[in-house]
């Protein structure tokens, strides 16, 4: 293998560790953490990681980016994390993760509304196919799945999708890297979760060694390190390569649920998962023409899109999912 190809393969493998890590969130939540504490869990995942990234980046927001960071932090972290963990507490990991594959449809609709980007027929078809695959999974398991958990999973996906589209609309400040912008959002989101966690869930629960280990894993490996690897890769890989890695998160969740937790999936549900993942990947890795210089996306401050300085914006709004919507998207 040539040195350049070997370097690219190594970079891709390291970047892929981020969505793989995010796919373990559901199993860690249900097996290691105190039950029914979605706000507390979201707080301990977001705030320590955000403060760590702020210490590493040593850059604070300026001007309008104070309130923009709060808005993005609320959508990408403050609302997303609690809803994500609520769904993780109430749904099997594979089920909760696959709901996130409807995210491209949310992104398409919000991109048309906020960015004026008209989706192509291929984008709409693949988005509908992904949603149909999700419906096969959810409807086939209607008797076993918790309604509140399903609603929380959809709401978390919608929240992250809105955050991704606004991130694309605003770009990032001149001279600020993705690590700093991620730190701003994690810190803002964690600070927003903190008072809600106290008001709704009361005092923090007593933690045993198992829970402490779970929280350390979520804050450090699953969030701080995973986000660093993700945005480092986003800046060096093409958009197609980055978005192709996204389905690794729900796939990991489903595999971990089956292999380690004894969860089962019916043949129809497996077909739905395959359809959803396949449609999402097909919509993101299809051939795209290179955009002209006039199509470069910059925010109001003139900065490029998060995670890829100077990157040109594709006309297909599906491409913005390459910003890390699974992950963190979290599921990510």
Stretch-by-stretch model annotation:
Residues 1-43, 132, 142-169, 191-192, ...:
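Glycine-/small-residue-enriched transmembrane alpha-helix faces in small-molecule transporters
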Residues 53, 110, 119-139, 157-160, ...:
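Hydrophobic transmembrane alpha-helices of multi-pass small-molecule transport proteins
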Residues 65-74, 119-130, 149-153, 175-185, ...:
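Cytoplasmic-side transmembrane-helix entry/capping segments in multi-pass membrane proteins
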Residues 7-11, 34-39, 43, 62-67, ...:
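Juxtamembrane helix-entry segments on the extracytoplasmic side of multipass membrane proteins
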Residues 40-51, 76, 81-118, 122-127, ...:
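Specific alpha-helical transmembrane segments that line the substrate/conduction pathway
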């Amino acid at each position: 293998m040539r040195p350049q190809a070997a370097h690219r393969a190594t970079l891709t493998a390291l970047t892929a560790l981020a969505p793989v890590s995010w796919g373990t969130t559901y199993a860690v939540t249900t097996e290691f953490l105190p039950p029914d504490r979605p706000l507390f869990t979201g707080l301990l995942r977001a705030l320590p990681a955000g403060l760590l990234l702020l210490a590493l980046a040593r850059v604070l927001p300026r001007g309008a980016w104070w309130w923009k960071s709060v808005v993005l932090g609320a959508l990408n972290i403050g609302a997303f994390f609690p809803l994500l963990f609520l769904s993780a507490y109430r749904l099997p990991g594979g089920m909760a993760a696959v709901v996130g594959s409807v995210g491209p449809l949310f992104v398409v609709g919000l991109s048309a509304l906020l960015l004026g980007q008209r989706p192509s027929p291929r984008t709409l078809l693949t988005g509908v196919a992904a949603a149909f695959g999700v419906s096969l999974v959810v409807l086939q398991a209607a008797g076993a799945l918790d309604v509140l958990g399903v609603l929380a999973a959809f709401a978390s996906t919608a929240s992250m999708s809105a955050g991704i589209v606004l991130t694309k609309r605003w770009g990032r400040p001149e001279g600020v890297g993705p690590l700093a912008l991620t730190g701003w959002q994690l810190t803002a989101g964690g600070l927003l979760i903190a008072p809600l966690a106290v008001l709704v869930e009361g005092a923090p629960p007593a933690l045993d060694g198992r829970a402490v280990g779970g929280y350390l894993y979520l804050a450090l490996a699953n969030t701080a390190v995973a986000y660093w690897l993700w945005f480092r890769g986003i800046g060096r890989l093409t958009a197609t390569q980055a978005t192709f890695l996204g389905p690794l998160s729900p796939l990991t969740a489903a595999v971990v649920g089956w292999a380690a937790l004894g969860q089962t999936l019916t043949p129809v549900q497996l077909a739905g998962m395959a359809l959803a993942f396949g449609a999402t990947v097909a919509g993101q890795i299809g051939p795209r023409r290179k955009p002209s210089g006039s199509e470069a996306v910059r925010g109001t401050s003139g900065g490029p899109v998060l995670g890829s300085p100077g990157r040109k914006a594709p006309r297909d709004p599906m491409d913005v999912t390459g910003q890390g919507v699974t992950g963190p998207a979290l599921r990510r």
